[in-house]
Amino acid sequence: MSTTTTIPGAAPKKKRNRIPLSCTICRKRKVKCDKTRPHCNQCTKTGVAHLCHYMEQNWAQDAKKEISKDNELKNLKERCKILEEKLARYMHNPAVTASLGASVVNSPVGLSSPVDAPIKLTNSPMVKLEDDTNMVDDMARPVKEHDYDELDLTRQFDLLHIKSNGTIHLGATHWLAIMKGDPYLKLLWTHIFTMREKLLEYYTNGSGHKRRKRQKNGGKCPIDHSKFKAAESEQKNHFVKTTPMVNDTPKSSIGKCPIDHRAMSNPVGVNSNAGQFQPMHPPHTHIVQNKCPVDHKVNDSNLTSANTDNKNAATKKCPINHSKYTKEKMQGAGLNDKPLTKQEVIEKLCQLLPPKRIIMLYIDKFFKHFYPVIPILDELNFKNNINQIFDLNSLISNTIMSTSSDLELEPITSMTLNKPTDYSNLGILIIIMRLVWLSLPMNSCKIDIENPLLNKLRTDHDFKNEDYESGSLASSLRLKDELQLLKYEVDGFALDLVKKHLIKFDEISSISNTNVNMSTIQFAVFFKFYLMNCANASSQGNSAGNFDNESHQILLSSIMMMAFSCGLHRDPDNFPQLNVVSANLTTDNTRSGPPSNSNRNGSETPSVSPKDTNVSIERAKHTWRKVWYYIVSLDVQQSLLLGSPRLIRNLNDISDTKLPSASKIDYVKDIKELIIIKNYTLFYQLDLCIVAVLNHTLNISIAKNVRKFELDALISNLQKLTDGEKGINDVINSLINHGLLSTSEVPIGLQKFDDIYDLPRMEDILLARKSEQEIVGDENERIGQDVDKKLDLPHEMTSKALFFSKHMTLRMLLYLLNYILFTHYEPLGAEDPTTTILAKNYAQKALDYALDGYRNCMLYFVGVSDQNPLFKYMNVILCFHSLDIGHRALQFIICLILRVKCGPLNGLKETQTIFGTSVPSSCNSSSVEDENTEEPNNLNQDNQFQDDLMQNINLDNSDSLAEKLMSRMVLFKQLTEKLAPKYSFSVRVMKSTGFFISLLTTPSGSFGSKKNGSKHKHGVGKLLLSNWKHPKISNIPALLSSDSDQLKKCPVYQDALGFMPSRPSVTNLPSISNVEGLLPNAQANGRMTPQLPPIRSYQPITYSSSHMRVTPNSESDARKLGPDSHQVTNPLIPSPLSPANQQQNQVNVLHMHQQRSMSPAPMPMMNPTAMTTNQNMIPERKYAPHSGAATPILPGTNSDIQQQTQMTRNDPYPTEQFSLPPISSAKNNMAWGTTPESEQGDHLTPNTTTSSLDTPDFEDFIIQNSNFNGLLINPNSLAEAMGSLPSGRDGAILNVNSFKDFTTSTNDKTITPNSADQTDLFSVDMASTDFLPIDNFAIDGFMDSANLDIGSIWE
């Protein structure tokens, strides 16, 4: 027998570095692979064909390049053939030929050569897809006829938000753009902004002085006076029994609040020195008091004689909990004082960070459940770096550390921070620990709403509070770890310390890039992700207005510039020197890692084999590619949310970085990373579909004249993708072949994608829980079975949750595209009845996808609450996205409710509605609703039981449409109330939803009372008043005929719609010969150019009131506030006017369009000089208010409409200090047919006394703003939603915190927030956050006109 001898000192035999031929999954499962491409039979049988992956051979790279060139040439030939066929079909279309001939005739230049026309056609998308020809027969003719209609999305949906400190542009995909594109929402928001400004002016002119006084006293008292009063009453009883009659305590101190409110008198948001408005403090930012605000002398004097009793002795303590103030003071001192040294920062961090074992548990939990959401780290490298910083000897191990008590309690005493990358890794670790702690199932928000719709949704999807691993050993270990993590919350102040004092991120991202490296970019991406999803968890106290990504727009641009400076846009294979650097970094990390068994004696440093070095180099390149494509995805996501252009466009022109799937890594030891690269490829393909939509809606060159068939093609492809009828590769190829997606958006070499790893259907994702329960049983039962069939369950479930999010995004785009086409064709029904069919079809599709987004939003939050495994750790990461989808759906629901309740808009000729009703515009819109609203009283109850969230709603069922949609709004309001304590960005959504609910239902103010409600034809629960229209309200829908060039400031009141038919001819206008330059275009075509009425929305109500029955300089004739007053209180009955007043007073310009006749009166032309400019808004206190310019009554208006004067106001504050200067001028008077002499007697002189300046009470304000196209709306609702509802007729304003007592009556039910566990939130966040994301100062300098502390009313 021969023996093999080993020569001492001989080098070990070098192993062959051969690329395996079997797939990764078969080698992992240790089964024989048949090597079938692209997917082997073993993987197909076991159900993991989508994960079958082969490593590429090095020698096959050159051959692959040659094959790819041949394939590319073949694809180009096929594409040219398709384009030629489309061009021939395009030229033979009669409609296209006619439109092309018309465009040539109307063109001022014409076609210079016959070649120009084909070139222009070949550069644009050709025709509609063949798949779209299978439409309904009755829709075939309109589709063919209107295929080449052009839409200008840059004009209809672009929004410029003008703030007091700057401007923000919001594009067509932002959720606010819908209120500008829809005519009903546009007019409603215009009315709301008018009411808002008047309400602000009403507060300014004395009615809010009590509120301002309370605000100057420091807001809410930090003492619970209920307990204090109980102790005081008990103390008085004790005094009666035990103390003598003589009491030296001053009477002024008895019962006095012990808080020294003068110490808290500095108002938030107002600079008392400069008198200018300052940015508001965030909701969670508390002012650090220098001393205790409790007046302890008063407190001691009240309770001195009670020290004999132990119970009363306890009351001598300060009633304020100083612990939180001490903590805030410490944190504030660390950030606001002088810069801290590195050693001081490390000492503070050691106190804030948890023990070593807890840190390791956080990291393991992140890479097991959260890593697929933001996979830009290399797990092995990151753990090595953290081990180097904290000396965690067992961190590199993949197994759970032993639960030894000494290791578990071992705190962090020191940190090793030797290089700048350590700072970034430390910051990433803190963000990871914050995300994991906030996402623990125990921290999820419980949705315990008793609603029939929600209960049925739970029943249909079997959402129960049970774990898919219940009873198993893994479940008990997981629960134990999570309970342990729950005890160690990492303070967000630690992140601020690292970001400001170690990384110095503000300097790096703004002025310097000397310290930018890969770790810095990774930290910046993590920080943006943290701000997007955990804004309320940041110690910096981000306001609730930051949830929609506007505040982080510049942060992403900084990240992108840092990525360009590091060269991430170039593939790392282009730079051979990266191999040496990556090898050195790998060697350093390995040496600094945990000691191995061979190095226990410390004899020598462990050597790194060349194979390990090559693997490390490839992993570094892999991380390079992952970071770059994640930044590209963030750019697409931000563009979709904000409607802003993408920062990285035509990726193929600026970048050659390969997808992470091109990395030469063997994933047999890390199957989780294999899922990551599959997700990267799929998500990038989905981003390409989103890019195709963004190009047609946001790119000015395309969106300016986008054609209907292009949008139809996008809708068809996205619909087939979401329904599972087409794969993602087929959709992308279809978009490219039909010119909807440029090839420059697809990087070179990425045209060949995986055909199997596709987006699953939504039904399969939601049913994944049952399939997983069937596969994954008890731990003991799984022994001996094929446990590798699903490979890694947590990553699989997290990926499916991400698929759910992608489905919501794609379906939101389908809703947006259908909504755009619906709003384009809806108003054209008066001229072309065929467009009504198109409009109704698009409206139905938009409603279906809106309800689908709403339904998925509810499914997500219910699943999080019931701990569905699909969303078990996604309660923070997907919360904002789901809430945004539901909020967008709610906007369209409001659109439809307005159409059902208001009917066709006034001011139009023959209006075709989407509900199949043709109504003459001259008829009152309320009469249409009278037929539909005559329903039995139990209709609502029947629909409540028949309604189902899983079913779509048909627009033809207009009888119950509004009530079904309203029930969904009510449920969404209840949902946001439950989310508000945990997620600050849901506060604004909740207030906006509550505002519209209170606006569209009978308000709880004046019109909701039993006295007035009993006189209404439809009672308290209905929205309309039968055939009643307020005689003094203006005809708001006349704004539809306005021009777009004269409104400059208000983000909704600008760029009025330009799709209306031409106005009546000039011959119908009254004689206005004294107007200079009024008709610049009338002589050319004989028609009146659409012009806008004057902007009077910012004119104070006290200056141009239209329903105030008081004679000037007569306090005796003012409205009496006593019980013996005989004034008419019913707002539906206008008070009669005397003949003298009818002859003396004239109609105000703002209210001259309202009519009682059957046909609308023509509007006068307006010179641009008649517009209110910014100079008119500058306050000048030496002027007094005016009563309004005199205006002649136009033909067709009711002669009973008269201009009234102001009412006497009973408050001690003079009006001169709050007044605005007169906005009328000589040009304005001439433009409206008046002379300066005609209004000299109407204006008040600066010497006018206070008694002659009249202010209306709140009911007059309500009556003046009560009608929107026949729909009764109440300005009380605006005050309710803002949390400052006036009480009674005296104009007293309730406390800001009264919003927590806000109730909404709808469908005979009352919704009341749970104030028991949300008191602090409602008292802080809701009072300081407006329900509108647009601030109150749409015109620069408007705040200066008041110069008062009223900012907290809106902000």
UniProtKB/Swiss-Prot annotation:
Which residue intervals are the DNA-binding region?
23-52
Chain residue ranges for the region called Disordered: 586-614, 918-942, 1221-1253
Pfam families the record matches: Fungal_trans (PF04082), Zn_clus (PF00172)
| Matches recorded under Gene3D superfamilies | 1.20.5.170, Zn(2)-C6 fungal-type DNA-binding domain (4.10.240.10)
- Renumbered to this chain, the Low complexity biased-composition regions fall at 589-603, 918-927
- Subcellular location(s) of the protein: Nucleus
Effect of gene knockout: Increases susceptibility to multiple azoles, including fluconazole.
Protein's UniProt keywords contain DNA-binding: yes
* Record-linked InterPro entries: bZIP_sf, Fungal_TF_Env_Response, Transcription_factor_dom_fun, Zn2-C6_fun-type_DNA-bd_sf, Zn2Cys6_DnaBD
Q: What domain of life?
A: Eukaryota
Q: GO cellular component terms?
A: mitochondrion; nucleus
Q: Name one GO molecular function term.
A: DNA-binding transcription repressor activity
Hey, what's the signal peptide range on this chain?
A: none
Q: What does the record give as the function of this protein?
A: Transcription factor that contributes to plasma membrane sphingolipid incorporation and membrane permeability, decreasing fluconazole accumulation. Regulates 337 genes under fluconazole stress, including several related to lipid biosynthesis pathways such as RSB1, encoding a sphingoid long-chain base efflux transporter. Associates with the promoter of RSB1 in the region containing two 5'-CCCCTCC-3' motifs and increases its promoter occupancy upon fluconazole stress.
Full protein name = Transcription factor MAR1
